[in-house]
Swiss-Prot record:
Superkingdom of origin organism: Eukaryota
Keyword vocabulary terms for this entry: Acetylation, Membrane, Mitochondrion, Mitochondrion inner membrane, Transmembrane, Transmembrane helix
Subcellular location: Mitochondrion inner membrane
General function of this protein: Scaffold protein that participates in the c-ring assembly of mitochondrial ATP synthase (F(1)F(0) ATP synthase or complex V) by facilitating the membrane insertion and oligomer formation of the subunit c/ATP5MC3. Participates in the incorporation of the c-ring into vestigial complexes. Additionally influences the incorporation of subunits MT-ATP6, MT-ATP8, ATP5MJ, and ATP5MK in the ATP synthase.
GO BP of this protein: mitochondrial proton-transporting ATP synthase complex assembly
InterPro entries found in the cross-reference section: TMEM242 (IPR009792)
Tagged with keyword Acetylation: yes
Residue numbers of N-acetylmethionine PTMs: M1
The protein's name: Transmembrane protein 242
Lipid bilayer topology: Multi-pass membrane protein
Subunit annotation: Interacts with the core subunits NDUFAF1, ECSIT and ACAD9 of the MCIA complex. Interacts with ATP5MC3, NDUFC2, TMEM70, MT-ND2 AND MT-ND3.
Gene Ontology CC terms, in alphabetical order: mitochondrial inner membrane
Mitochondrial intermembrane side: 51-81
Length: 141
């Protein structure tokens, strides 16, 4: 019994095909890039919020870094717990939205997704002119 793609060099389904090495490399690079951007964004947001809180009221910031009888949990451990839950909710939310868009478009691979997005959104015109010369643009007159 032959599969639907036998003889044509095409697999019967997208699940059977391992994909080319270039496609896998593209996926890995894309995943690493998105993970790095997400981690950098989370870290920058957390550090910015922490520095603003310390700048606004340093005495309360220092008071919140140690657990007391009135507050059994220190402010920093509470903040780290909130960061953990917030990160979990953010990752799950983005995953659910991505999955919903993927299923709504009815695509089965990244190539299908790319072609579907290119058909939905307008094309970006390629400008044959050279890039803007910033030195001349920003030069004071």
């Amino acid at each position: 019994m032959e599969t639907a793609g036998a003889g044509t060099g095409q697999p019967a389904s997208g699940l059977e095909a391992p994909g080319s090495a270039d496609d896998r490399l593209f996926l890995v690079k894309g995943g690493i890039f998105l993970g790095t951007v997400a981690a950098a964004g989370m870290l920058a947001g957390f550090i910015t919020t922490l520095s603003l809180a310390k700048k606004k009221s340093p005495e309360w910031f220092n008071k919140g870094s140690m657990a007391t009888a009135a507050l059994p949990e220190s402010g920093s451990s509470l903040a780290l717990r909130a960061l953990g839950w917030g990160s979990l909710y953010a990752w799950c939310g983005v995953g659910v939205i991505s999955f919903a868009v993927w299923k709504a478009l009815g695509v089965h691979s990244m190539k299908d997704f790319r072609s579907k997005m290119q058909s939905i959104f307008p094309t970006i015109p390629k400008n044959s002119e050279s890039a803007v010369e910033w030195e001349e643009t920003l030069k004071s007159k």
